Amino acid sequence: MDAAFVIATIIKILIVLGLFSALAGFGTYVERKVLAFMQRRLGPMHVGPYGLLQVLADGIKLFTKEDFIPQGAVRPVFMIAPVITAATAFIAMAAIPMFPEFTIGGYTVKPIISDINVGLLFVLGVMAAGLYGPLLAGMSSGNKWALLGAARTAIQFLSYEVVTGLSVLAPVMIVGSISLVDFNNYQAGGMGNWLIWKQPLAFVLFLIAGYAETNRTPFDLLEHEAEVISGYATEYSGMRWGMFFIGEYANMFTIGFLVSLIFLGGFNDWGFIPGAIAILIKVFFFFFLFLWTRASWPHVRPDQLMWLCWKVLMPLAVINVVITGIVMSI
């Protein structure tokens, strides 16, 4: 392992940490503006031009708020839970190829921290491990609303992880690999080669499961204000609460990259649009879709969430895998 590789990897890690932490903060501004537009309001307007400095003001507020730990909390677990959420969100990005290769000063740069041949499995596995953050936070807070939020975390994440895995199984059978780079290369050659045309059902199933994995409306039962206050995060404040928040937004971008790489051609050129710009358009479209859904859809009840998972999405995912296997064997 040469020094150039180590230095390049460290730089990539720092870029991912800095960029997506900043995007998580800026994402709040975009979300508030999008929701305001859809509700015929203005949103943030007073801090800086068009409210652009609201993100900075919110960041200062989080950094300076008191780090309060409840008297009945299990202190070590309570303190480590937000770190688990943020860490798993960023670790999952290590195996995601975000842009095409490019050259700087004769050195070829691969915009991926770790190009492993089990990239898809790694990303899904690390994202699944992220459930321990909200789960431990709720169980260690000594608060009944937080405990209810933790219970919802367990049933929601564990159930929809199965749907996520089954939905990508059919595309994996077609590509013959679980490397995200191989998924991208398989779809080279234009829109006609995108996997969404061969696996439209898998695309829909994976996207719906992505909403549940990221705790976004209509599946935001973990911290539904009208039912469980702030759920698992009820007793958190300051930067510990901010870590949960950063993890959620980072996971939204991760899902956007996964959907783009698996089903929508990844970072291959999109007509006259270069690949790097093309994948950014796709990722930010899905980020906007998360916000659009929040403004348009009501919350679902926990029983409706489980009914949708086990009686609708799960059978459809299994049927899709069976049909794909039959078609490939003919």
Swiss-Prot record:
It catalyses: a quinone + NADH + 5 H(+)(in) = a quinol + NAD(+) + 4 H(+)(out). PROSITE patterns: COMPLEX1_ND1_1 (PS00667). It is a multi-pass membrane protein. GO terms for biological process: aerobic respiration. The chain crosses the membrane at residues 3-23, 76-96, 118-138, 161-181, 188-208, 244-264, 272-292, 307-327. PANTHER family: NADH DEHYDROGENASE SUBUNIT 1, NADH-UBIQUINONE OXIDOREDUCTASE CHAIN 1. Disulfide bonds: none annotated. NDH-1 shuttles electrons from NADH, via FMN and iron-sulfur (Fe-S) centers, to quinones in the respiratory chain. The immediate electron acceptor for the enzyme in this species is believed to be ubiquinone. Couples the redox reaction to proton translocation (for every two electrons transferred, four hydrogen ions are translocated across the cytoplasmic membrane), and thus conserves the redox energy in a proton gradient. This subunit may bind ubiquinone. NDH-1 is composed of 14 different subunits. Subunits NuoA, H, J, K, L, M, N constitute the membrane sector of the complex. Keywords: Cell inner membrane, Cell membrane, Membrane, NAD, Quinone, Translocase, Transmembrane, Transmembrane helix, Ubiquinone. It is found in: Cell inner membrane. The keyword Translocase applies. Its EC number is 7.1.1.-. This is NADH-quinone oxidoreductase subunit H. One of its GO terms (molecular function) is NADH dehydrogenase activity. GO terms for cellular component: plasma membrane. Belongs to the complex I subunit 1 family. InterPro entries: NADH_UbQ_OxRdtase_su1/FPO, NADH_UbQ_OxRdtase_su1_CS. The keyword tRNA-binding does not apply. It comes from Nitratiruptor sp. (strain SB155-2).
